[in-house]
């Protein structure tokens, strides 16, 4: 089990106020410490900040996150939580694009697969996972969740900033994005419990990436894609 968190705004340059936003990332990361006591790191980019807490399982030395890779000068970044069951198959697919992972980390294999094949690669992934990829060149943030929703991934928005995290409390570390009970969502959980309809939940404005879907945020807005 690991923890991921972060934020994204297509116009805001977070590095212009680096100390302030690094402090927010630190708070988000600290709230998820129990999910990953082996390693905790943050990274801040122009339009995105990422935090990760790691419980090391695969490639203990080389799987540090947030992880970054580049192709043709374009930079991509990932934070990931999960377990992939068909890594050899995914790595074989990368050979078709003349790409070879430098490590045995499943995180790197996922990121290189995104670089090579775009969002469609997720259809080939067998596992339980939630992860976020920030594409600097296209200025997009993509949030992915496994088909059965085993790994949690929450997100919300505050003044145009997208906030995401493995747990609600990580999202609520972002200034101004405060927990507010959604009475209709709460009623659903008590009536149907633990089931609830998509986009409904305990906290107003806080959503879960639906199982078997990815959400893309860009300067043009956001869209949920089933796969």
Please annotate each region the language model reported:
Residues 1-227:
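Cysteine-centered catalytic environments shared across enzyme families
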């Amino acid at each position: 089990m690991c923890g991921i968190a972060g934020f994204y705004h297509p116009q805001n340059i977070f590095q212009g106020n680096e100390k302030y936003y690094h402090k927010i990332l630190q708070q988000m990361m600290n709230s998820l410490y129990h999910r990953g006591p082996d390693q905790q790191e943050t990274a801040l980019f122009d339009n995105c900040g990422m935090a990760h807490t790691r419980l090391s399982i695969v490639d203990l030395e080389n799987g540090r996150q947030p992880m970054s890779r580049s192709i043709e000068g374009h930079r991509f970044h990932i934070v990931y939580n999960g377990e992939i069951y068909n890594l050899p198959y995914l790595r074989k697919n990368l050979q078709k694009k003349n790409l070879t992972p430098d490590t045995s980390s499943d995180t790197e294999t996922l990121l290189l697969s995104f670089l090579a094949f775009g969002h469609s690669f997720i259809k080939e992934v067998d596992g339980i996972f939630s992860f976020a990829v920030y594409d600097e060149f296209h200025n997009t943030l993509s949030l992915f969740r496994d088909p059965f929703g085993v790994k949690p991934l929450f997100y919300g928005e505050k003044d145009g900033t997208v906030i995401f995290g493995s747990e609600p409390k990580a999202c609520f570390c972002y200034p101004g994005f405060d927990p507010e009970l959604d009475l209709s969502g709460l009623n659903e959980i008590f009536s149907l419990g633990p089931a609830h309809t998509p986009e409904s939940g305990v906290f107003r404005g806080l959503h879960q990436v639906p199982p078997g879907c990815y959400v893309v945020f860009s300067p043009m807005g956001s869209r949920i894609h089933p796969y």
